[in-house]
Amino acid sequence: MKKTKTVLILAAVTGVLFLGGCGSEKTKIYEQAGKDLSQGSYKYALEEYQSSIQNGVKLAQSYRGAGIASLRLGKYEDAVNSFTEALNCDKVSKSLCKDILSYRATAELKSGKYEDAMADCQTLGEDFSMDAGSYFLTGKVALAMDSYEEAASNFKQAYGEDSTYDMAIEIYEAYLDKDMEADGTRYLEAALSSEAKDAQDHCDRGRVYYYMEDYSNAKKELLEATKKDNTEALLLLGMVYLAQDDVENAQAMYKQYISAVGDSAKGYNGLALCDIRSGDYDSALDNITKGLPTAATDEMQSLLFNEIVAYEKKLDFATALTKVQEYIEMFPEDSAAKKERAFLKTRTSSEG
C-alpha cells in the first residue's frame, strides 16, 4: 500500500513538472514573439504570436502582437481582424483598448477603409483622453477623406501636444502625400524656431532643412551632428548629397553609415539609389539584395520599389513587371506602383 502511494505521488509530481514545463515553453514562445517584434523580425513574430493564440497565452496581447506584425508586413486586412479579435477578448484594460483601437484605425487607413478608421478615431475621442498621437492619426484619416479643416484642426492639436521635430516632419509628410506641401511647410518652419541643444537637435534640424530643400543649411547642421558621433546624420548627409547630384560624396556617407552601424537596409538602399543615379544597375540590385534581410516593412517597400526601377532601367521590362505585380500584392495602396505597372504592361505587350 505504501509503495503504491509513493508511485502515485511520484506520478503526480512528474505530471506537475511536465505541465509546468509545457506552460514554460508556451510562455517562452510569447516572450520571443515580443523580442522579434521589437527587433523588426515581423514574420517570426507573427508566427510566434499565432502559436501563442493557439496556446491561449495572453490572448488580447497575442492578438495585438499578431496585428502589429501583420501591419508591419503590409497585411492590413489580417491586421484589422487580429485587432478586432483582441478588442473582443475578456478583461481588456482601458489603456490596452486605446492602444489597440489606434492600431486598428492605422490598419484601416492603410487598407483604404477610411470610414472605419474615422469611426475608431471618433471612439478614441469619445471614450479616451486624446494625446498627440491620437490627434495626428485623426488628422491623417481626415486628410485621406479630404476633410481638410478637420485635418488642420487635429494636426494643430497634435503639434500643440508634441512640438518636436519629429511631429513637424510627420505632419509635413502627411500633407506632402496629398500634394499640399505649403500646409505642411509651416510646421517645419515652426520647428526651426528653437535653437539646437545637442547632436540630435542638429541632426533633426538638418532633416527639416532637407525636407525644405535648403541643402546648404542641412549640410551645416548635419556636419555639426557628425562631429558628435551622430550616425543618423551620416545617412541624412547621403540623402542631401544625392539630392544635389553629388553621387560620390553620397556613396561615401552611406558606406560610412554602414561601417558605423553594421548591415543596414537604409544604408544599402542609399547605395542602390546612388547606383541607379550613376547607371550601375547591377550594383544597385546587389545592394538591394544585401539590404532586404534586415529591412523593416517601410524599408523593404523602398528597396523593392527601387528593385523595380533598376530592372526597368536595365530594359528588362518582363522582370520589372513581375516584380511590380509582387510588390502591389504586398503594398496595395501604392498608387505610384500601379502607374508603374500600367506603363510596364505597355512595354511588355509592345515587345510581344
Positions of PLM-derived features:
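Start-of-helix register in tetratricopeptide repeats
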Residues: 27-28, 61, 95-99, 133, ...
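Register position in tetratricopeptide repeats
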Residues: 38-39, 72-73, 110, 144-145, ...
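Short coil turns that delineate tetratricopeptide repeat
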Residues: 57, 91, 95, 128-130, ...
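Canonical tetratricopeptide repeat
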Residues: 65, 72, 96-103, 137, ...
